[in-house]
Amino acid sequence: MNEKLSFMPSLTDAYVIGMKNVTSIVVAVILYVLTVWIPYINVGTTIAISNLPVELSKGKVISPLSIFDAKYRNVMGEYFLLQGVMAAGIGIGFAFLVIPAIVISISWSMAVYLLLDKKISWAQCLTESNKMTMGYKWKIFFLQLALAFVIFITLMIGTNIPYIGWLIVHIAVIVGLCAAVSLNAVIYRELQKNDEKPAAAE
């Protein structure tokens, strides 16, 4: 049985997916920024951007124009309710010296994807997300930390190189954005597999 979320394979897979969809992701983000001021439309596009990892997890090459699909606006009530509950729970976690907030945020990190992909209630999304991430929280944390570290180092190098540093920074931002979205896609895809979960301590 293949182990879920192995470190290097997951990062490599995220990079491959990100580069395969780099144009689509960048154009989708640009379209989102250009239209974010339009009332009502901006609700759907915000939800659509949140859904990018779900689409990427299915092996699709996404269409940037899909962020304008009406189906995303149809779930705005459940989406806002879910986000509000998550923000409240994580906020309370911060009041207990940060670490509980980090654990809760990872536990619920799949909830939005489940809402948009499986069309289940917001409360069930939180429960299912917690079940999915059980035993994998450390892996998720270190995968995201590793990606953030690589992006940070690249940006630091770019800002200290004369003449071409700005180009390195811009490339790092684009690649980092695509890799971050793609890493979430890999995590969501892997956690949906029906393999037996490890009994690792949280």
Task: List the predicted regions and their residue ranges.
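A generic structured-segment signal
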Residues: A14, L52-L56, I67
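Membrane-helix interface linkers and caps
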Residues: G59-A70
